[in-house]
């Protein structure tokens, strides 16, 4: 064995390649071993350093792959065990274990995260050369559960003839048997890039040391560090401990070698300054101007600005002659940056490769399998059928057809096998009695889904090969492959490559399932669960089509001298250094206790114990990753959390490397900021979209004027337009063309009292409801609208019944007649919940109707339609529920309400309570048209309710209870003062609601003023997002948050403030304000 080390300014790979060539030229077979994460890059680097740029005697690989070279044809043929097969086997094992066998983990049997933890523990134990019984655990019940699970897994592996040992363990067994002595005698193993071995790797090294021609292990250590006796906290602590342990174990002295090629002195000086800092020695080295040019620290506002500035600098470097493959981008937090790196690099036309496997779990193919399995498991649940259809892999239906089908399922609340097995018949009807859903088309989709799924789900328990064939036949019947191809072809080229990799993984999972379970008797439900679980656990990786791309990866996977230009992003205190804390089914404490019990060839790696020395070595590798220029960057805000610079960066700053504060990407850095056409266009768009935070210099203004003219010509040539973007709460005015069609000048504007209320509640709500015509989704389950319609119909029948029979009989008969109508049978007979609602409505109808006999009025008409015109500009349509007549001949209006509603003069003034005045105006106009002087007594609401009383409030059960009960069943609204004596004997609440004829006229005139003012604003076509507020602190109007993104605490300034007056001055004050407004005094305040 040879142990080599060299200074960081040298190329360790160059030194080790020279060693490899010497052995290869002497006839030995050389395996050049690199860590798993670096093997691809290392292979390219080794080839670049070979004298002839290639050699059949030198193989660059990993430990596991080297093992396969030797054992592929030497051992008994057994099935290889990959992660997906292991996942399916764990699912099968857990499925068969009962609650008595698993006391702790039984509830997690089907949990995907738990199964992944089991897979990770299985591989960790293989790497540690340990079994589950060897682990010291604090909770014995938990250990017993894990022993039960892994024992059952071992039996399954043996039964299915899987290789239970890892490839390294099989390799070691072959070495011990002597089968490989002849080959290993001419084999040299060169190991590069390691600062520690796992227990399994260390055991393999021990075996190879006895059989191989030579083992060469190299690492980076400075001559100064290697001479130190005390190395705790040293920058090279990890590699020093690594070599010294090997030196002691194998009684070999470490040798220092220097390479022919050395890298820039800037990085060497910086490394020696860091080394002196951590070994507490003195040095005369200082930071020169060359170092400041080669190593830069950038402080950024946030991660978006950080990536933007990096992209702009990359474009500049490309203009200086660098190629994409010369550039490496390192990320401090891959999860936080990967979603933003792609779009920004695409904007700047920077091809990149992020060497990170992507999970299949969010791909539509996995969603299809998940929905299919859930549909089988949960008996045709509505949500699963919808998701299955939306995956677009079951049938060739348009998006519109899928949306209509989903809308109908939600409306009719279709759930379960029985509901899907028969034709859908329930439907909605509009006012013209037109059907709301095209049931012919919807039933065609239902028939297609049901026929294929029902045929597929009929499968019984059978052999795995048969059940898989049945599944493949189902995919063939629904033309699954064509559907997948059709969806993929509509995607970008990159997404198509991802789809291809996903498809490969899917077919590989099906192949693994067949190989494992072809002779096993399984149910269809278990089969789908096993395939789905493997797909959810699967990862895929897209390989770039060209090598000339910018490499992007995590900074802790870098090695020294990787690329010419290196940009390290996200180097905050939180992520640099990283604090690794292992999570899983066993704790670090349990790992440590287990290690105390076993030797070095049987132990766990505990990352948390080695965090410090590993982080120092990672920082050293990062600071020497570039050969020309290194940019170290950190944002002040990351993931919406305020961050500060890494301690390592602060240390470099203390040496004299300045921190460059990169401000927000403005438009001043012209010569460096414009890298290509797309980035120029994006900045011009930003210039037009955002208000400038600073004045531009004359030179900058001239530049952007010229660029604007150029880009406008380019856009015009391509027939593209540049839409102007407003702030997130701003709305655009409707175009004149739309207004001319929607509101022709020669036609009056059609409004209703409810539309007027909606307009004053929030103008944008009026736009959505009455301009765009958006409606709430219908449901077969009745809501307040249906309840109100039902009660209206009952009262209509009661009032129309003029027979001389007991009033209670009239009510009962009216209820029965209403219940027989098709509309109400649809809503109130579909299920137990709707039938319960019907019983409550019947009680309300009986209670509310009980005041009809004691009301001293005559009903003149019901459900009377009217049309009212204001100055030929507004046409108001509506329906009056009931018109009553007193004994003196005066008439009034009754409007039924399913909720507590009163006439409030303050809300009326603010445009929120115009119904009763509108109805009074309509009745007044009707009477005038008959050439009769109108004689009105008022307009009122009747709250339809079944009053509940708290009997604890009464000492005696006497007439006061009945009096209190009927006090809640009263008419409330607007009453004429002159009719007071005729109303006194009825159930009318007249307190504070009596108006003189002059006051009533004032109300009606102001009501007309509200309609005309709204008409003028609506015809202007600009609808504001302005829900109303009563107190200036809370918003009462409909905010429509899901559409407008209105936030009360941020956007309160856009809310419409209602005018309020003190209670004592309320009536007189608002009547006075109405007169002033109609005279033009305060028109703009409403």
From Swiss-Prot:
An example of a GO molecular function for this protein is:
helicase activity
What are the GO BP annotations of this UniProt entry? double-strand break repair via homologous recombination
Instruction: Look up the record and name the cofactor or cofactors this protein needs.
Output: Mg(2+)
EC number(s) reported in the record: 3.1.-.-
PANTHER family documented for this protein: RECBCD ENZYME SUBUNIT RECC
Q: What else is known?
A: Despite having helicase-like domains, this subunit does not have helicase activity.
Q: Which family does the record claim for this protein?
A: Belongs to the helicase family. AddB/RexB type 2 subfamily.
What protein am I looking at? ATP-dependent helicase/deoxyribonuclease subunit B
